[in-house]
């Protein structure tokens, strides 16, 4: 059976991949894409979906499911890249960030999680003090990072007062550092404990210094799946409600979807549909981030991981379906550098940030990158190698540096594969 390494070598080295990349790169007009699709044998359903996408029309729930069940990778890549280039051209975004993970101790017992430890397993975990967390932040004094990403387990002593004080202390120490922190899983827990509603809680967090919310904790919204893999924590409806209250304050957030485990294709589309509906109402989401299920060191180790082909199909369908989301992100640390590069031709326009080996959430689940860290130079080169323009952004997608004409000294490609370069 082919593994992901074999798939990647086949894709990168295949002449069909080179032709495909050369055909779709810069193919951002309707006529150009229609010409490519006219040379293929498509079902009536796929022709109708392509027509909708190329003319800016929204595809339906049923059409989303049909794409998962019937569309081939090449077709999806052409359409997803069309949407990507309509929105962003060749621009690919990244940021300079670091993660702050207060604890891996957690009151919840999610079946897919390789990171957390229950409170009864304290000897296997950590719980940082406020001072220790601030010491981590201070390590980056003088460094050109723009964001601290705070997320971890749910621990009872980390309550509304604790996180409010933490956010305030970070902003007082370094006002220019954007605080992106906690998911609705944490917020639901601490607000319930404090006996305050979501609207009040989110207002308090904003006043304390919170500036945006990451997309974690979404998993799969539908209770048919959620009750099996994460039954104890907030429901899909509660997750969405917390983001909606945050958006009402004029603030921004991201959204994720955990795919490739026990869910069916229609569960994925249901998940994206709920996000799309909320985005129609609030416009507060910036980025949609599909997260690949990893099966190491968790209670779902018997579930096989999906292939890189399915990863790329999923990114492409997400880009096609999530028409009101500006950005689709691939976490390079989770899927590998090579797959992240491939994803840039399947709808992805953001590959996250430098990380600086500050997260254990990916590596403990068996991610490709066990010590996730890349310099700015490495990230820029990674993007340029596949013919895209590297843009350093801040959390809100303001441009920090356009690296289009920047050439680093001793710019080299990794030796373990050779990518076709598109001019």
Where are the language model's segments positioned?
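Auxiliary Fe-S-binding modules of radical SAM enzymes
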Residues: 20-74, 141, 279-423
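Polybasic, lysine-rich low-complexity intrinsically disordered segments
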Residues: 3, 9-10, 23
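Conserved, mostly hydrophobic/aromatic
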Residues: 56, 80, 110, 150, ...
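Glycine-rich, proline-tolerant flexible connector loops at the mouths of alpha/beta enzymes
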Residues: 98, 151-160, 223, 296, ...
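Hydrophobic faces of well-ordered beta-strands that scaffold small-molecule active sites
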Residues: 92-98, 148, 179-183, 213-215, ...
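Conserved Radical SAM active-site core
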Residues: 66-67, 117-257, 261-270, 274-278
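N-terminal pre-triad scaffold of radical SAM enzymes
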Residues: 65, 75-119, 125-151
């Amino acid at each position: 059976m082919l593994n992901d390494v074999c798939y990647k070598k086949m894709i990168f080295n295949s002449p069909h991949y080179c032709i495909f990349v050369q055909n779709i790169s810069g193919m951002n007009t309707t006529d150009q894409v229609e010409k490519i699709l006219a040379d293929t044998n498509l079902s009536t359903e796929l022709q109708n979906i392509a027509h909708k996408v190329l003319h800016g029309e929204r595809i339906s729930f049923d059409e989303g499911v049909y794409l998962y069940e019937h569309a081939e990778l090449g077709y999806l890549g052409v359409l997803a890249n069309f949407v990507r280039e309509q929105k962003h051209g060749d621009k690919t975004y990244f940021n300079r960030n670091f993660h702050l993970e207060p604890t891996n101790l957690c009151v919840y017992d999610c079946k897919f999680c390789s990171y957390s430890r229950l409170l009864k397993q304290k000897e296997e975990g950590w719980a940082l003090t406020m001072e220790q967390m601030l010491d981590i932040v201070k390590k980056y004094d003088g460094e050109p990072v723009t964001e601290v990403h705070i997320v971890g387990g749910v621990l009872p002593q980390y309550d509304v007062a604790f996180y409010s004080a933490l956010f305030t202390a970070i902003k007082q120490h370094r006002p220019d550092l954007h605080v992106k922190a906690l998911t609705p899983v944490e917020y639901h827990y601490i607000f319930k404990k404090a006996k305050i509603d979501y609207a009040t809680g989110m207002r308090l967090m904003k006043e304390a210094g919170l500036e945006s919310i990451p997309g974690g904790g979404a998993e799969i919204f539908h209770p048919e799946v959620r009750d099996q893999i994460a039954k104890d924590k907030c429901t899909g409806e509660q997750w969405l409600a917390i983001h909606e209250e945050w958006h009402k304050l004029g603030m921004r957030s991201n959204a994720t979807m955990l795919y490739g485990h026990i869910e069916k294709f229609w569960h994925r589309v249901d998940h994206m549909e709920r996000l799309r509906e909320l985005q129609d109402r609030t416009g507060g989401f910036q980025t949609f981030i599909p997260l690949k299920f990893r099966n190491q060191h968790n209670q779902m180790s018997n579930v096989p991981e999906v292939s890189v082909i399915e990863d790329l199909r999923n990114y492409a369908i997400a880009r096609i379906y999530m028409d009101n989301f500006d950005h689709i992100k691939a976490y390079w640390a989770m899927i590998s550098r090579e797959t992240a590069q491939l994803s840039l031709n399947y709808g992805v326009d953001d590959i996250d940030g430098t990380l600086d080996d500050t997260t254990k959430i990916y590596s403990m689940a068996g991610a490709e990158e066990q010590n996730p860290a890349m310099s700015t130079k490495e990230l820029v080169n990674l993007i340029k190698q596949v013919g895209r323009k590297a843009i350093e952004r801040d959390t809100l997608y303001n441009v920090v540096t356009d690296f289009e004409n920047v050439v680093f000294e001793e710019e080299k490609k990794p030796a373990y594969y050779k990518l076709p370069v598109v001019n």
